C-alpha cells in the first residue's frame, strides 16, 4: 500500500505520505531566517556553488527556465543577472518561502522576469517540452519520490534542454566523511539555535541523508 511506504527525513525514517507535510512545516518555521541559515550552514559557500552550477547552463536567446524548490529565489536572480531576457518560472511547495522570493524579486528589481507559483516538483503543472533549462538547488533531497520528480523535470524539458541539479552527496573520502559528520552533528545544530524555532527539524531537512 502507498501509505505504508517509507522514506527518510534527515536520519529519521518516516511514512512517505507524511514527508511533504513535514518538509512544508519545517520551511514554514525557518522561512524568515532561511538565507542566514544557509550562510551559517555552508559558511557562505552555497552562493559559490550555485554560481558554479549556473556556469554550466547553455541557453538560447530568450530562454524559458523553470526553477524548482526556489526558496528565496537565489538561483532565479543569478540566472536573470546573466541572461536578462530569460523568463523564469519560480516554484516551491511552500508558500511562505515563495512569498519571500517574490518580495526579494520586487526589492531587487528582477520581478518582471519571474512568475511565481506554489507547486510540487513531483507534479509539475506544465506542458511537455516547455523549458530550455530546469534547475533545482538543495531541494531534491526533500522530495518524497525523487525518481518521479526527475521524470517530471525531464518531461518539461524541450529537446536538447538541460537539467541542472545542485545537491549534497556522501563524501567518498573517509577522512572528509568523518569531518563532515562531526560538523553536521556538532556545529549545525548550534548554528540553527539562532535561526530556527525547531533547530533539530531544520538540521534534518538539510542533511544529505535525506537525499
Regions found by a protein language model. Name each.
Residues 162-190:
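Conserved class I S-adenosyl-L-methionine
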Residues 33, 43-61, 78:
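Conserved alpha-helix/loop element of class I SAM-dependent methyltransferases that forms part
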Residues 1-24:
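N-terminal auxiliary segments of SAM/dcSAM-dependent transferases
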Residues 64-123:
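Class I SAM-dependent methyltransferase SAM/SAH-binding core
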Residues 122-133:
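A short acidic, Gly/Pro-enriched loop at the edge of an enzyme's catalytic core
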Residues 34, 134-135:
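Hydrophobic beta-strand segment of the Class I
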Residues 147-159:
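A short glycine-rich, Lys/Arg-flanked "PGG" loop and its adjoining helix->strand segment in the class I
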Residues 194-211:
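Single conserved hydrophobic/aromatic residue that forms the stacking wall/gate
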